[in-house]
């Protein structure tokens, strides 16, 4: 397993990015200013994008694992990689996600704790309703962990 930074042609991984953020113009808002990594294990299995949000905060804007590779530790490996890579450069790793039964437990298992909520984020910023595991996403839940 190898994790490497992607510095150009980030849109080559659009199909994977859209697994985590299904509206392309929302991905475009952070993709170019963000730092992107892919996890390879006999081919690309997962990706993540992080951005500098100031005040010592690194935000995980997008993390996705190919559907047939989920549950194999690739997502956790990316989070662990980010913590190891950015320790000393940032004090907090944060992520914003929907209040979904598939994402919140994953982030909590990676050491994140709920921090704050942005009301109506998904209804205000997406042009269509977003559903995850049958749950209509409305509010953005922010979780943080120290690094």
Where are these regions (language model features)?
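Conserved GNAT acetyl-CoA-binding A-motif
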Residues: 86-98
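Conserved acetyl-CoA pyrophosphate-binding loop and the N-cap/start of the following alpha-helix
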Residues: 69, 73-81
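Conserved catalytic-core motifs of GNAT/GCN5-like acyltransferases
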Residues: 94-96, 108, 113-134
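Short hydrophobic/aromatic beta-strand or adjacent loop that forms the aromatic wall/cage
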Residues: 34-36, 137-142
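Conserved N-terminal entry element of GNAT/NAT acetyltransferase domains
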Residues: 1-9, 141, 147
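Short secondary-structure capping/turn micro-motifs that flank functional sites
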Residues: 33, 101-102, 122-124
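Acetyl-CoA-dependent GNAT
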Residues: 4-67, 79
């Amino acid at each position: 397993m190898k994790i490497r930074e992607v510095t150009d042609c980030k849109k080559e991984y659009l199909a994977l990015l859209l697994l985590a953020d299904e509206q392309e113009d929302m991905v475009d808002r952070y993709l170019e200013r963000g730092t992107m990594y892919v996890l390879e294990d006999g081919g690309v299995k997962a990706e993540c994008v992080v951005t500098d949000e100031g005040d010592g905060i690194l935000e995980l804007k997008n993390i996705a694992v190919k559907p047939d590779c989920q549950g194999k530790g690739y997502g956790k490996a990316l989070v662990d990689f980010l913590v190891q890579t950015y320790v000393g450069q940032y004090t907090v790793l944060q992520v914003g996600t929907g209040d979904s039964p598939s994402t919140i437990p994953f982030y909590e298992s990676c050491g994140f704790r709920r921090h704050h909520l942005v009301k109506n984020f998904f209804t205000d910023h997406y042009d269509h309703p977003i559903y995850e595991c049958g749950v209509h996403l409305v509010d953005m839940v922010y979780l943080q962990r120290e690094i």
